[in-house]
């Protein structure tokens, strides 16, 4: 899916404490992972109120593969998120990325990031997201996925959801949150934030954060780290001092190859260590 949202990039969300930075695409750095040896396609995921679209990838064959839920940035399940799914499949996972604000609107219809946030993202309730991720996990379990070895990872908007879903689903063995919001003013749609749930995590979460993030302060990261330690959690937070928000997004100028590679290696080790691989 080639979406018009790839014509611009966002350094962070304007809502919930995220600073916004619009920059041009940096296509020359974008990583492309082929689908050789994989089963990979767009899908429809049955939900309690119908269905939502998504994308999945897994190794070809009839084995059962550890499931990883891949949670989108604000731009939805665009080519970068699909590529991340294929990267996981090359490692032996069944990776699935549901479109988590499909009901609120198609973000590819908007050219301006303010419209994406104001008309779509800000209207997505956390309860809906949790149900849809449950549905994605159930779908994966019927399609060669091993949900007893299930991990979750997400980026930016999806980083916050990674913390929440790890607290929501007792089947999650481990999570990796890439620069997700940790604190914020609660409201009807978002009644809790990750820092409120440190004592409810069903599996350990590895947080990967940026020292030069203009939307997530180091003070916020430090408060989260302190809360985790106070609760005796084995979750960890790693800060890349010289990186910006979006350092894993290889199609943006914010991409930091060294930090992204290190984070990806740490993710794999984290999943292996905690039973999600």
Give each language-model segment a name.
Residues 1-16:
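N-terminal secretory signal peptides and thylakoid transit peptides that target proteins
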Residues 29-60:
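N-terminal cap/lid segment of alpha/beta-hydrolase-fold proteins
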Residues 65-73:
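Short beta-strand element of the alpha/beta-hydrolase
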Residues 79-98, 102-103:
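Short amphipathic alpha-helix adjacent to the substrate-entry channel of hydrolases
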Residues 111-151, 276:
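Gly/Ser-rich "nucleophile elbow"/oxyanion-hole loop immediately N-terminal to the catalytic nucleophile
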Residues 138-194:
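Primarily recognizes the serine-hydrolase "nucleophile elbow" in alpha/beta-hydrolase
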Residues 185-231, 236:
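The feature captures the conserved acid-bearing segment of alpha/beta-hydrolase catalytic domains
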Residues 234-277:
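C-terminal catalytic histidine-bearing segment of alpha/beta-hydrolase fold enzymes
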